[in-house]
Structure formats: C-alpha cells, structure tokens
Amino acid sequence: MGLQFRILYAKNDGKDGTSVFDLPQTANATGFCGSDSSSLTLTFHDDAFNVTFDFVKSARRTGASRFHVSAIEISYTELSSFFPGTKSPDGRRQVKNNTMDIFSADADKSYMCNTDMNITVTKDVSILVRKVQLQPFGVKSGQFSWAQVCSQDSGDKGGVNIAAIVIGVIAGVALLAGVFAYVIMSEKKRQDYRSLNSD
C-alpha cells in the first residue's frame, strides 16, 4: 500500500504552502482488533507524523456484515524539512474526519483497489492511496481472505465487457442487414426474371 500526503499550510510570507510527502517503508504500524471495530495507526519520521484509520463492522439489511473506514485522524509536526517557510515551525497539528465511508467490503473478505484514490480528510489535508489491500476483521494465519475489488477496478473490466458487447451487436446488425439485402435482391431478380418470361 502506498500513501502520499498533501497538506496545505501557512507560510511566513503570508502565502500558502503545500507539503507533499510519501509514507516511508520504515513506518511503524500498530493498532487493535475488536469484534465490531478496529484501528490501524501508522507512525513515521520519529513520531512527527501519525495517521489512524478507524474501521467499523455493521450489519446490512441482507444480514451480511460489511466493514468500512469510518474515521481518519492525522497528527503531525510542521517540521521545516517538510513545511519549508512555515509560519509555525515545530507546531503540532491534528485533523480528523469522523464521517468517512471508504474501503468498504464484506466483513469476511479483504478490500483491494489498484486504482489511485484521492481521499479528502479536511479542506487542507488529503491522502492519495495507491494499490491498497486491507482486512480489519477475520484475518486467519496472517493471510488476506478472498479480495473484494473496488468499483474503480471492476469498472475497468466492465468497460472491456461493454466494448465486446457493442462490437457483437454491431456485427449482428451488419449480418442481419446483409441477409435482408440478399433476400431483397433475390426477390427483385426473381420479379425481373418473371417479367422477362411473361413478355
């Protein structure tokens, strides 16, 4: 899974700056797993940055349970190496969105998406997520369960199927048009032949 953070911040010169940085491979992952809720916290750059994803499991009308990310919280320090010219060097910030409904899948499956997704946490903070597979509940032997693919990925496959259907319909219409043209031409030749015989 790849995460890229984009954070707007105030600069000394009165202008706005944009800090863009990736989740390093050395990030530390912690969390907890409950029966209906779980969380994943990623900590990196000597605890200067923390991002927490809260997952919940809920029953649907069909009786099947599903999970999704319900909240994302990001706390960070405005380090000058990531926030050049910041108005608040070493200032600590915290943002949270409790109204998220992303990364949804059946509770007994994993969620997988290869398409890049831009997640808006607040008006000033967003996360670009790349090639994600996650499963907050029911992990067995450290392995993901069967993956439920996101609509963005399955939509691409659906586009291929639609193209095949359209080509098939066009070929069928062309074949029918050819058959009708042959029947009409045959009937016309037959009528011309009869009119010659009657003379």
Over which residues does each language-model region extend?
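C-terminal single-pass transmembrane alpha-helix
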Residues: 150-199
